Every structure is written in C-alpha cells, then in structure tokens.
Swiss-Prot record:
Organism: Yersinia enterocolitica serotype O:8 / biotype 1B (strain NCTC 13174 / 8081)
One MF term in the entry's GO annotations: S-adenosylmethionine-dependent methyltransferase activity
Location of the protein in the cell: Cytoplasm
Full protein name: Ribosomal RNA large subunit methyltransferase M
UniProt xrefs under InterPro entries: RlmM_FDX (IPR040739), RlmM_THUMP-like (IPR048646), RNA_MeTrfase_FtsJ_dom (IPR002877), rRNA_MeTrfase_M (IPR011224), SAM-dependent_MTases_sf (IPR029063)
Length: 368
C-alpha cells in the first residue's frame, strides 16, 4: 500500500521534519501520523487514506519545507531481499505503480552507518535500471520532466521503493547538492552561502540577481567565508566585523572592512542590493536586525542564518518567520520569504527574504 511518504532530513532533526510535514498535511486536511527514529536521517509519514500520500507530494510545495531534503511516496518496507536477486522484488513493487519514469536514484540516509551502503547502491543501480527499462517502469532515456523512482535502502537487505515528482522534489541525489570547497576560501562556511544561492535563486535569474558590480553588506563577516562568495561574483562588499578579514579578500580591492559591531552598523550607501549575515546570536535578535534592514529599505534581498536552540527548534523557526512576515506587512512591504536547513548548515537554518515592493513611498529601494 502506497499510503506513506518518506522524507530525508539531517540526522538529529527527525522530530522537526515530522512536526513540519504533519503541520503541512493538516493544512490540506490530510491526516496521518509520523514514524520517527532518532538520528536515522529520515521520517515516514503514514496517511490514513490511501490516495492522500500521492496528493501530499503533489500539493505540499517542496520549496516550502524547511527540514526535508527530499520527499517521496513509498510502499511497505521490502525486507530480507535475497542476495542472489535483489532486483526482481524491487521491480515488482513498482509494476503498475509507475510508468516511464525519467530517472532512478538508489539512495541511503545521510548517516555514517548508512554511508557504508553507498558502494552497494552504486553496484545495484545499473542492473536495476536495465530491468526497470525492460518493464517500462523507466523511460529508455533520462527525462527531467517525468517522475523520479527512488529505492531507499535503510540496511543491506531492506529498502523502501517509491517515487517523487520532478516538478516538486529536490533535483539532487539524496537531496544533497555536490559543492566543492574552494581551496582559496577563508572558511568552510562559504559553502553555506553558495548552497543558499542554488536553493533559493533559480539558475535563470542568477545573471540578474547575482550580478557583477552589485553592492553587498556582510554582517559578522570575519574571516570572510560569505564575503568570498560575493567577491567571486564580482560584487563590491562592505564587510562588517570587529575581527580580522582574510588578506586575500582585502587584496581584491572589492572589500571595504568596517570594524563595527554588526548589530550597530547602519549603511551610508543607498544602492545596496544584498545583505548577508551569519552571526552566532539568538534567533530573535538576528531576525529583528534583518527586519530593520528590510523595513528601512537598506537592501533588496537578504540571506541569513538562525542558530537554533536545543529544544522546540521547529517552533522557534516558525515564530521567527512569522515575525518577519507580520512586521514587513505592518510596514507596507510585500516580500517573498523562504527557509531551509541546508546540507552545509549544522544546528541552524538559512533564511532568504526578497522585497517585492513597498507600499510606503520614498523608501530607498524604490530608487534602484
């Protein structure tokens, strides 16, 4: 019975992922219950009605899920797959369920234990793909516009089999973008901002919204991991931090370093497009800082991190996003708000806010 959905998430954030999908499902009047195993890297949500699982992965916008890396319909757990023929039972599960899917992904959860299965998954992929093409479960060639077949192994002989829709899923294997750490970047945090650009900004809009010559501000910049990404895109950056910036960034001539507390700095320029911020501080304090920048029209788009407490993490994120939405609306500002726990995030989520227009005349950003 395909009345379940599986969601991949960061290990340790299963409860948050479960709370989020339960909330989203209830908003669609879809009811069920989540099965959570701590530190497993995935969550199962079982719907009471058979057809609701498919409806859920169609109607819950994947881009709005904060803690889920992938979302798919799955059937019952296939157990004790025979070592001499693991392919046939998997193909049998999909017969009559999926036709001419565009891609096959044989995956595991993102945990140290599961990673030991990755070599096995790669080895199984080719014979499985061939068998699925023979049975017309997969199309003869990969097609990005067709559903994706997922074979999700939780142990060597146990897997869930299912599908996702290519217009409402993560395009990445295991839901993880493969980014390479640049050897000249001052810190690994640079990958957070690079991933955020991939997740929040459509590729066909990069030229317009991540354009050469733009002005940007990085609050809490040192040593310059996030500034590095802006410099690489030929932006002019105001780096705000009492600490030291990497000399390699200063040598570019694109960075002006202000030794000021990020919470106290106020810009003198009126043409700042990007604000980025990765400061270790309570979420509500960072949220209020970003709201101040947006309400004053000091920037057009912002990407920032919210460091999460040990408990009530889903509630804290929800409250802060609601706070942004409410206060911007109170000030006559329409904005597009997104949030995601990125692969390169740890105990935090990354938020993106884009001002669409202002109902209050004379704001700085209306003069862009």
């Amino acid at each position: 019975m395909n009345n379940k959905i599986a969601l991949y998430c960061r290990s340790g954030f299963e409860k948050e992922c479960a709370a989020e999908i339960t909330t989203k499902a209830a908003q669609l009047e879809i009811f069920g219950f989540a099965r959570v195993k701590e530190n497993s890297g995935y969550v199962l949500f079982e719907c009471y009605q058979l057809e609701d699982a498919d409806r859920l992965i169609r109607e819950v916008p994947f881009r709005e899920l904060i803690f889920a890396r992938q979302m798919m319909v799955v059937g019952e757990l296939l157990k004790d797959l025979p070592p001499e023929d693991r392919v046939s039972p998997i193909v049998g599960m999909l017969t009559g369920v999926v036709e001419k899917a565009g891609e096959l992904r044989v995956e595991v959860a993102d945990t140290n234990e599961s990673k030991e299965l990755l070599k096995f998954c790669r080895k199984l992929t080719v014979p499985l793909r061939n068998a699925m093409r023979e049975q017309k479960i997969l199309s003869a060639r990969e097609n990005p516009h067709r559903p994706v077949v997922h074979v999700f192994f939780i142990a060597s002989g146990c897997c869930y089999v299912g599908y996702s829709y290519s217009n409402n899923n993560s395009p990445f294997y295991m839901g993880i973008p493969r980014l390479k750490f640049p050897s000249d970047a001052p810190s690994r945090s640079t990958l957070k901002l690079e991933e955020a650009f991939h997740v929040f900004i459509p590729a066909d809009e990069w030229e317009e919204r991540l354009a050469s010559g733009m002005h940007a501000v990085d609050l809490g910049a040192c040593p310059g991991g996030w500034t590095y990404q802006l410099v690489q895109r030929s932006m002019m950056v105001q780096a705000i931090d009492n600490g030291l910036m990497a000399q390699s960034l200063m040598d570019t001539g694109q960075v002006t370093h202000h030794r000021v507390d990020g919470f106290k700095y106020e810009p003198t320029r009126s043409n700042i497009y990007w604000l980025v911020c990765d400061m270790v501080e309570k979420p509500a304090k960072v949220t209020q800082l970003i709201i101040k920048w947006l309400v004053n029209g000091w920037c057009r788009e912002a990407i920032f991190n919210l460091k999460l407490p040990m408990k009530k993490r889903f509630e804290v994120v929800s409250e802060n996003l609601e706070m942004i939405d409410e206060q911007l609306k109170e000030n006559g500002i329409n904005a597009h708000i997104q949030a995601k726990q990125l692969y390169h995030d740890r105990e935090e989520v990354t938020v993106h806010v884009r001002r669409i227009w202002s109902g209050v005349p004379g704001r700085r950003d209306e003069r862009f």
